[in-house]
């Protein structure tokens, strides 16, 4: 039995995400999207009357996935948990990499996204602070409250701008699918290395060994 075709709106969002990630949102027109889908511009307009609505719909999906992931922050109890949490975050960033690649451009023309991005930064900062609180409570880190505040902010900054850094380093290939694994590992490693100075006892050697493995 043939599978029922995905609803048109779902197909539109899937193809739009691929195109945005590949070419960057500013370089993708609704004409290109409808052509790639082999549907009429009118059909695309029926589902999403403006390109901003496509961006907002994709951001909502990203936000839902991000919120679910960040809700796991209280469960980070050791170095391995922290590595897995960080790597999973970077996988999500990669999946919606156009948001990070074109962040300044998107913010300059989409007021709704502007507010949502701000909320997202606060949510990430809170989640990272929760991770640091948990690791301090478990004795993995020896870190003060003020150090946790600063480190959580540094982690969010690095997570948010890592792909931009990768893109500047290698603009022709950094955001291509074949570069994903290496980029994600580098990003997760560098963010996690921010907690290394605070690692307590044997946890420092454990963390250094984990970072060296990647």
Question: Which residues does each PLM region occupy?
Answer:
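Short, Lys/Arg-enriched anionic-surface-contact patches
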Residues: 1-9
